[in-house]
Amino acid sequence: VAEEAKVVAQEMGCIVYSTYDVGVAGIHRLFEPLKEVIEKEVDVVVVVAGREGALASVVAGLVDIPVIAVPTSNSYGFGEKGVSTLMAMLQSCSLGLAVVNIDGGVAAGAVAALIANRAGKFRIRS
């Protein structure tokens, strides 16, 4: 799913930086990638998460960059097939967070690229 988002954004002309395995269960792994996101002045962040889906809310709460959340069908128990992940992401109180459908990597990549390309046009004018 993350690779779908990456490929779509690249095909739409974006430079893509990727980081994997930075879930909230080992939250210490998140800080270095977020530091890089801020230093590189990226225009949008795509967060792909399964299980309880908390990663997107955490990221959106820590950065002032639009975050696109992608729930995955990689789930367990009551929330099987990504339903609880989707619901958790939709209920997030973090501002600047948008959510696409379960396993919606293509949609996330397209929206991220539209945001980044639009921001890039204004950056060039400045």
Short names for language-model regions:
Residues 1-35:
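Glycine-rich phosphate/diphosphate-binding loop of Rossmann-like nucleotide-binding domains
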Residues 35-37, 44, 66, 71-126:
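C-terminal binding/interaction regions
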Residues 10-12, 58-66, 114-117:
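Alpha-helix C-terminal capping segments
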Residues 1-4, 27-29, 49-58, 79, ...:
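Short glycine/serine/threonine-rich phosphate/pyrophosphate-binding segments
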Residues 22-48, 54, 58-63:
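N-terminal small/polar loop signature for handling phosphorylated ligands or for N-terminal nucleophile
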